[in-house]
A protein has these predicted regions:
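Conserved acidic, metal-coordinating active-site core of Asp-based
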Residues: 101, 108-173
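Flexible loop residues that form catalytic
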Residues: 11, 69, 163
Length: 173
């Protein structure tokens, strides 16, 4: 049986705990596979913009499955081959609910990630490395009003990264 395709996750698989460094052995393995004619795919929960650094470092990735499968991108021309975007009406409804609570969340849409200053400031308080946070901010687009994002893009997914304990029960209703 010949291997035709290799797909790898990013966080915790391709990169280490710092979310940034790709071990040399992984770079060599992916490039060796490419030399043998094997298709290389990154499959990640990240947006394409937040995965661009890893794709560039490897230099041998053919396709990216992004936002937990919401879109598949052909990296030859950056075109979306297939997608499963969230319903616009439902997305607006979700944002209206989110805005009632002090939630830390990201919007992934049109191959990019979007965050508020509030989300970024709260991420800085987490245990993520400062170097990653600096990189993260350059790859995410800041918004003032999430409705501007969801009304003008194709939303792939939301990441709710922090929910205060006092809000959990109310959100389940």
């Amino acid at each position: 049986m010949d291997i035709k395709l290799i797909a790898t996750d990013v966080d915790g698989t391709l990169v280490g705990a710092d979310h940034m460094v790709i071990p040399k052995v992984n770079i060599e393995a992916m490039n060796m596979a490419k030399e043998k004619g094997i298709i290389n795919v990154i499959s990640t929960g990240r947006s394409l913009s937040l995965t661009a650094g890893e794709i560039e470092k490897l230099g041998c990735i053919d396709y990216a499955v992004i936002s937990n499968g919401a879109a598949v991108v052909d990296l030859k021309d950056n075109s979306v081959m297939t997608s499963c975007y969230l319903d616009k009406e439902k997305v607006e409804e979700i944002v209206n609910i989110f805005n009632k609570y002090p939630l830390v969340y990201e919007i992934y849409a049109d191959k990019k990630g979007f965050i508020s200053q509030y989300t970024y400031d709260n991420f800085r308080k987490c245990s993520l490395p400062n170097e990653f946070m600096d990189y993260y901010k350059t790859k995410m687009e800041m918004y003032d009003d999430p409705m501007d994002v969801v009304r003008n893009t194709n939303v792939e997914k939301f990441n709710v990264d922090y929910t205060p304990e006092e809000c959990v029960e109310d959100l389940y209703k």
